[in-house]
Structures are given as structure tokens and as C-alpha cells.
Amino acid sequence: VGDVTIVTSDSRFRLSETSLGIPPAQIAPFVRERVGLTHARRLMLTGARFKGDEAVNFGIAHLVVADSEELEEACNEILSDISVCAPDANAFTKNILFESLRRPRSEVLDYAAAGFANCMLSPEGNEGVAAFIQKRKPYWVEGSLRK
């Protein structure tokens, strides 16, 4: 399961396990989380084929582009966007999101608050706030002067 998934309009998908006589056991929970129970049932029980635009509609992909050239451009844009975000902050953000699937909301809020405080006191957090105040790029951004 990718954080950001880009497909071409002619990308082809199929959850074909049941047509092979086996259940989609390993992927089923992830597909159900991503597309919902109703779509997961149809896609898995029929082995339905679908293309890139439908993958976006199902929530399997985030963006559909016309061809491989546009795919490379879109990937570069996404990577550029990610590169301006602090690596540790992104890692903890992913942890919060995954914990929100496993824990009650009140526990996740406590977990997130503690992590926020730790990040604010970390070298990365200090650098991010200082860079913002000083109107400069933080050290993790390509092309910044500080490392």
C-alpha cells in the first residue's frame, strides 16, 4: 500500500485470486480498508478487471495520468513535494495514521500529542521552526544552504 499512488489511464488491474481457486487472503484486509466492503466484495468475488481511472475512483490510486511520460513528471512532482517535508515528521505522521486504525481516538490523541511535543523539541523540529521564522529553507530541503 503506497503513500501516494499514481497510475496511467491504460494501467490494468485485477484481483484474480478467486479465478485461480484461491482466496485473496493476504491482500483482502488492505483492499477492504482502501475501497470499502461493497467494492471489495465485487472486485474480489468476480475477479473484475479495471483500469487507472477506476482505480482512482475506488481509492486504490490517487492520481491518473495519460501515459508514462506524464507518470514520470507526476512522480517527480510528488517527490519534490515530499522533499520539503521533514523526514522524521513524516514518519511520525504515518505512525499516527496507522495507530488511528488500532487504538481508540482518545489514545491516538494522547499518542499524537506526545509525539508532537517530542518533534517540537527535536533537532528537526527546532530547524523547521527556525527556518520558518528566518524565512529560509530547512536543511532537509534540496538546495538549502545549511546541512
Put a short name on every predicted segment:
Residues P104-V108:
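Short beta-strand->loop
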Residues V1-D88, N126-A130, R136:
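Crotonase-fold acyl-CoA enzyme core
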Residues H62, I82, S100, F116-C119, ...:
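Conserved short C-terminal alpha-helix that flanks the catalytic cleft of nucleotide-sugar-dependent
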Residues A130-K147:
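Terminal low-complexity tails and localization/encapsulation signals of metabolic enzymes
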Residues L43-M44, A55, I96-S100, A114-M120:
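Helix-loop "lid/cap" segments that line or gate small-molecule binding pockets
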Residues E17, E99-R102:
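A short acidic, helix-capping loop that chelates divalent metal ions and anchors anionic groups
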Residues L109, S122-G125:
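Amphipathic alpha-helical segment in the mid-to-C-terminal domain
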